[in-house]
Amino acid sequence: MTFNLSEQQEKKYLQQVIGIINDTIQNTDTSVKEHVETLQEYKDYIWSNKDIDPHEIRSMRESILNHFALGESVIDKRRRLGKILDIPYFGRIDFEEKKNGSSVLPIYIGIHTFYDSQSKTNLIYDWRAPISGMFYDYELGKAVYTSPTGEISGDISLKRQYRIRKGKMEYMIESSLTVHDEILQKELSSNADDKMKNIV
């Protein structure tokens, strides 16, 4: 069974992903604020206690540097989240690994990886990740990518491209080929919609 079979289901899923990204952004903003407040407390303490002994200064310096480094990484994460909020992903492949008991894995591909800590899954894979390379290198059918544990082979059963702007899906194309031209993408999408309307 295909995950998010229709365009309507895909649009609903997109809004769910954006909701999770927004929640993560709020948590990240809270974390940034906490780091800033902690650094301000250190600064105030140093200014109000001019006669601190050198040993205490050394340990405080270490804590300040750690907080600063953590704060920088949180700010970097916030910047990445801001980038993926408007356009979370642009492509998808459904891949089933060739081994017993494996199921079809929908792989959404975007400019950055997004890991959902609640469900403990990657909702979006970075386009440079080895698994994402199959989107560019293969059509439907047999496919292979190299993971840290070795070569993984299987089958691609679905390939889609999306046009998402400001968190809204403008259209999607289901195709065995990767179409890069934007005008052609839009035309293919509207033709596919017309065909579906005629069938229904």
Where are these regions (language model features)?
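Extended, charged low-complexity regulatory segments
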Residues: 1-198
